[in-house]
Amino acid sequence: MDNYEFSELLKTLKNKVGNIASIIKPENIQTRLKEIEELENSPSFWSDVKQAGIIGKEKTKITNLLKNYENAFNALNDASELFDLANSENDTETLEALFNDAPKLEDTITSLEISMLLSGENDGKNAIVSIHPGAGGTESNDWASILYRMYLRFCEREGFKVETLDFQEGEEAGLKDVSFLVKGENAYGYLKAENGIHRLVRTSPFDSAGRRHTSFSSVMVSPELDDDIEIEIEEKDIRIDYYRASGAGGQHVNKTESAVRITHFPTGIVVQCQNDRSQHKNKATAFKMLKSRLYELELMKQQDSANTGEKSEIGWGHQIRSYVLFPYQQVKDNRSGEAFSQVDNILDGDIKKMIEGVLIALKAE
């Protein structure tokens, strides 16, 4: 990097921070934080625990947003002032240090962008994630299990907690279906970027001839809804099936019909839960999963998305991302256009940077 390139980078980053400031309005955030502080000092504030909780979450979110803005603004100003000073004094050592720190400065601005992009109504909520293998039997089942592990490792890296709601093992390998709840700040905000079809190209470990195979899995992500959000489900529109739990689940497996499956006829959505020993609890969780999926579907309709939320046949033309392990190694996201060669790291859950690239690209559309 030279003086001209760094100068151009500063201009780009200043424009970016200026645009963000015009959207988030830092002065309005400061005013709102003062209002919340006054509310918290009111004796009656804590009498409504539910409302206090809602305001508490708002305070945390906008405090973090303001902090990220101030960090970015100050870092950019400091770098700009130091650059001007070093230039005027022809201080090559300081200039070299600034050039070396340029990626760190860009990361600071990216953190601000992401905190702004995750300020939506549902972004701070927990996420319900379902993975369904496409046609292809063992090969696709194995790919679904690889994706499942990738998300578990991502959640571990981010400090998110995971609760498995439904897990159905594949007959030979992998899994037939899995649904899990991810708990943590902005869990849905991040994982919503994973909604879609994921394509894998590799030499199959299940093919004795060592031929190249292409597999698909569908990932569906919806926000876990608060209890106060009303989603009307008519009894005539659903069928509830009870069956014996299978797979890893403890001593109660295959002894009682504790597992619950709900089919919603108007949309074709099917949810199932076998997480608990209690049929009653599994039924309540399955209804919660269904409501979240219906809510996500309605959001997509409101956004005039071409995808109505019902995944078409899992196959060509619908994937959001391709993972190529053979004949070369690359993961490419179709929405951001970004390609990554560190395939092993990505499959081990190092997907945050890739997700952030998607969030920024989708916002720019």
UniProtKB/Swiss-Prot annotation:
Q: Which GO terms describe its cellular component?
A: cytoplasm
Superkingdom: Bacteria
Give residues where N5-methylglutamine occurs.
Q251
Any idea which GO molecular function terms this record carries?
Answer: translation release factor activity, codon specific
User: Does Cytoplasm show up as a keyword for this record?
Assistant: yes
Q: List UniProt keywords, sorted A-Z.
A: Cytoplasm, Methylation, Protein biosynthesis
Q: How is it modified after translation?
A: Methylated by PrmC. Methylation increases the termination efficiency of RF2.
Give a single Pfam family match.
PCRF
Record's subcellular location: Cytoplasm
| InterPro entries in the cross-refs | PCRF (IPR005139), Pep_chain_release_fac_I (IPR000352), Pep_chain_release_fac_I_sf (IPR045853), PrfB (IPR004374)
Keyword Isomerase present in the record's keywords: the answer is no
Q: Which family does it belong to?
A: Belongs to the prokaryotic/mitochondrial release factor family.
Annotated function: Peptide chain release factor 2 directs the termination of translation in response to the peptide chain termination codons UGA and UAA.
HAMAP family from the entry? Rel_fac_2
The identity of this protein, by name, is Peptide chain release factor 2
Q: What organism is the protein native to?
A: Campylobacter jejuni subsp. jejuni serotype O:2 (strain ATCC 700819 / NCTC 11168)
